[in-house]
């Protein structure tokens, strides 16, 4: 009887993503031709937890005309920034039986630009991706070129962003599939970002496993050493590559339906909290994003319930 009840729960979980998709998940990421009003943004996008791409949202930013690799070289080239370095472009990702975190180096931005332009070489793949508001903390000289927040979003959400992050890296740098507890406004200033999404309702089809955390260490010879972080707890992470999923190992993922979009220069993506996302980029893509903490309300509680049931039922 207990097994029958458990199978009934599994059946409901398998059917839930399709039901949610029919009710509230778009078939493609919609476009807006201009920034929404605070009311429109909150009512039509934040409340229903739906992504959108907003055109003409950055037109008033000087950065849109000024930011380029030559401009960075002239204005902040001598500034040292934190750079994630990995052998294959995957930072904070599952590699083998480890959750691998990048080696972190402090490098002059001019050297990063040299690598991006093919003037210099460095072992591995470089990505300026340190979060925790690396734009104001590491590159404050660039702040006059953009707004410190997104006014209509700040008004709609009733708060200021927790972090303003700067992103610059090689085309080989990839962000593995994951979710965040932030309302994310992702602004591409130059180049393109390629996103793959899953709504939170796809959680029953998205596997998680526990991994020993480890960090890449760059040796003097230019090779990478894996160092286990023995003092840290195991990390739950998604082992699956959505671009080449191992369906023999994770057959349930075949029932998930991803959305894909490309965010181009001058466009802003609203990525709702709890949406799973995987990110690629063009070479030397320049982007800034604003993280607004989500409301930990009933919507969050329902997702936690879905997550817990997925784990308890053995679908994970």
UniProtKB/Swiss-Prot annotation:
It is found in: Nucleus; Cytoplasm. Residues 128-307 form the JmjC domain. This is Bifunctional peptidase and (3S)-lysyl hydroxylase JMJD7. Its cofactor is Fe(2+). It catalyses: L-lysyl-[protein] + 2-oxoglutarate + O2 = (3S)-3-hydroxy-L-lysyl-[protein] + succinate + CO2. Fe cation binds at residues 178, 180, 277. GO terms for cellular component: cytoplasm; cytosol; nucleus. It comes from Homo sapiens (Human). The gene is JMJD7. The keyword Oxidoreductase applies. Signal peptide: none annotated. Keywords: Aminopeptidase, Cytoplasm, Disulfide bond, Hydrolase, Iron, Metal-binding, Monooxygenase, Nucleus, Oxidoreductase, Protease. Bifunctional enzyme that acts both as an endopeptidase and 2-oxoglutarate-dependent monooxygenase. Endopeptidase that cleaves histones N-terminal tails at the carboxyl side of methylated arginine or lysine residues, to generate 'tailless nucleosomes', which may trigger transcription elongation. Preferentially recognizes and cleaves monomethylated and dimethylated arginine residues of histones H2, H3 and H4. After initial cleavage, continues to digest histones tails via its aminopeptidase activity. Additionally, may play a role in protein biosynthesis by modifying the translation machinery. Homodimer; disulfide-linked. Interacts with DRG1 and DRG2. Its EC number is 1.14.11.63, 3.4.-.-. GO terms for biological process: protein hydroxylation; proteolysis. GO terms for molecular function: 2-oxoglutarate-dependent dioxygenase activity; aminopeptidase activity; endopeptidase activity; metal ion binding; monooxygenase activity; peptidyl-lysine 3-dioxygenase activity. Changing residue 277 to A: Loss of peptidase activity toward methylated histones and reduced anchorage-independent growth of transformed cells. SUPFAM superfamilies: Clavaminate synthase-like (SSF51197). InterPro entries: Cupin_8, JmjC_dom, RmlC-like_jellyroll. Its main location: nucleus.
């Amino acid at each position: 009887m207990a097994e029958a009840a458990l199978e009934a729960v599994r059946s409901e979980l398998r059917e839930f993503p399709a039901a949610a998709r029919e009710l509230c998940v778009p078939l493609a990421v919609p476009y807006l031709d201009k920034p929404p009003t605070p009311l429109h943004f909150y009512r039509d996008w934040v409340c229903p937890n739906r992504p959108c791409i907003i055109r003409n949202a950055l037109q008033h930013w000087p950065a849109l005309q000024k930011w380029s690799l030559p401009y960075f070289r002239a204005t902040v080239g001598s500034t040292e920034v934190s750079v994630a370095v990995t052998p294959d472009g995957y930072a904070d990702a599952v590699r083998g039986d480890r959750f691998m975190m990048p080696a972190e180096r402090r490098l002059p931005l001019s050297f990063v630009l040299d690598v991006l332009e093919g003037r210099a070489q460095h072992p591995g793949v470089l990505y300026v991706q340190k979060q925790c508001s690396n734009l104001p903390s590491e590159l404050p000289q660039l702040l006059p070129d953009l707004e410190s927040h997104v006014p209509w979003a700040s008004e709609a959400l009733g708060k200021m962003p927790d972090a303003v992050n700067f992103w610059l890296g090689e085309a080989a740098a990839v962000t593995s599939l994951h979710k965040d507890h932030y309302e994310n406004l992702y602004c591409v200033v130059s180049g393109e970002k390629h996103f793959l999404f899953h709504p939170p309702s796809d959680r029953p089809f998205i596997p998680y496993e526990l991994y020993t955390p480890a960090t890449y260490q760059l040796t003097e010879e230019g090779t990478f050493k894996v160092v286990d972080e023995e003092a840290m707890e195991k990390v739950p992470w998604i082992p699956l590559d959505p671009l080449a999923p191992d369906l023999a190992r994770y057959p349930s993922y075949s029932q998930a339906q991803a959305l894909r979009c490309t965010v181009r220069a001058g466009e802003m993506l609203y990525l709702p909290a709890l949406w799973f996302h995987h990110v690629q980029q063009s070479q030397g893509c320049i982007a800034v994003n604003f993280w607004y903490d989500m409301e930990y309300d009933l919507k969050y509680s329902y997702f936690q319930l879905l997550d817990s049931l997925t784990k308890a039922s053995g679908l994970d």
